[in-house]
Structures are given as C-alpha cells and as structure tokens.
C-alpha cells in the first residue's frame, strides 16, 4: 500500500521518528507513545494537514513523502471496533486507547484507521518501534509538492 505524509520543513529531521505524536498525542495515540500518521492518498494528506494549519502563510513550507507498506504488515481496524464517538473533537480517550494498545502490542507495522475528515478513506498509524520499521524506510521517496496558493 502506498501512503503519504506531509511535513513542515523545519520538522524534516523527525519525519520518521513519531516525535510529534509522542509529544502531543493524536486521535489514535496517547502522549508518550510514538506513532507516525500517514494518509492513503495525497489529497487526504493535504486535508489532514490543512485542518491543523492556523497560518496560511506557512503553506509553502511543506514537503511530501511517499512510503510503501506491504499489506501483510497492516492491520485494519474494523468498523465494528470503532468507538461510537470516534469522530469527536477533541479526540476522545477511546480512540487513543485503541491506538495506544495496538502500538504497545507491536502486533503489526501499521494500523489502518478511518479518517475523521473523510470517513470513507483511511489513515494509517505506523509504529516506529515495530521490528519491520527500519526495513520499510528504504521505500521512502520525496515527491514534488506544493499547496495551491488558493487554499487558505
């Protein structure tokens, strides 16, 4: 599966560490647990980035990466396992509990979860502590990218 990640240039050094999610937490992980959030398409990666941008003058400061994760290394979070409040804002503890438990189990390299912005599309949590993590990094490629300046 091809996946995508958009990163602000000043954070390029930590792109594949899980530092941001570990420091601040995320929808599918508690603080203190490293995770790397990826999107299943470039357009979804853009939406997932734009929803967090507070200053549109920073739109020119991002880079796009593509990574390939073998389907056999991905676990799908089944819809029947989604908490009823999974789309709540701020993110509920129920979703953080699910992702954190998965991270700690190291049962797969990736966990496919629904996007709250586009529920019919998926994001993937990548576990930087999984035994296959370093191997998958060899597939990372930077892609040419720029947000359209009309986006604000």
Swiss-Prot record:
Superkingdom field: Bacteria
This enzyme's EC code(s): 2.4.2.-
EC class: transferase
Alphabetized UniProt keyword annotations: NAD, Nucleotidyltransferase, Toxin-antitoxin system, Transferase
Coiled-coil parts of chain: none
MF annotations from Gene Ontology: nucleotidyltransferase activity
Keyword Calcium: no
Keyword Transferase in record: yes
Family matches, as InterPro entries: RES_dom
Quaternary structure annotation from Swiss-Prot or TrEMBL: Homodimer. Forms a complex with cognate antitoxin Xre.
Similarity-based family: Belongs to the MbcT/ParT/Res family.
Function: Toxic component of a type II toxin-antitoxin (TA) system. Expression in E.coli inhibits cell growth; bacteriostasis is neutralized by expression of cognate antitoxin Xre. Probably depletes intracellular NAD(+).
Protein name: Toxin Res
Lineage start: Bacteria, Pseudomonadati, Pseudomonadota, Gammaproteobacteria, Enterobacterales
């Amino acid at each position: 599966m091809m996946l995508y990640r958009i990163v602000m240039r000043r954070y390029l050094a930590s792109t594949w560490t899980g530092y941001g999610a570990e420091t601040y937490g995320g929808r599918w992980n508690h603080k203190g647990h490293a995770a790397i959030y990826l999107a299943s398409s470039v357009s979804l990666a853009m939406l997932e980035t734009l929803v967090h941008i507070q200053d549109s003058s920073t739109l020119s400061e991002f880079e796009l990466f593509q990574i390939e994760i073998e389907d056999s290394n991905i676990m799908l979070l089944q819809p029947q396992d989604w908490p009823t409040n999974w789309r709540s804002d701020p993110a509920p503890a129920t979703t953080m509990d699910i992702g954190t438990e998965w991270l700690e189990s190291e049962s797969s390299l990736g966990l496919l979860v629904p996007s709250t912005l586009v529920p019919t599309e998926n994001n993937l949590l990548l576990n930087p502590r999984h035994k296959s993590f370093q191997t998958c990094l060899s597939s990372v490629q930077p892609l040419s990218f720029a947000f359209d300046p009309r986006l604000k």
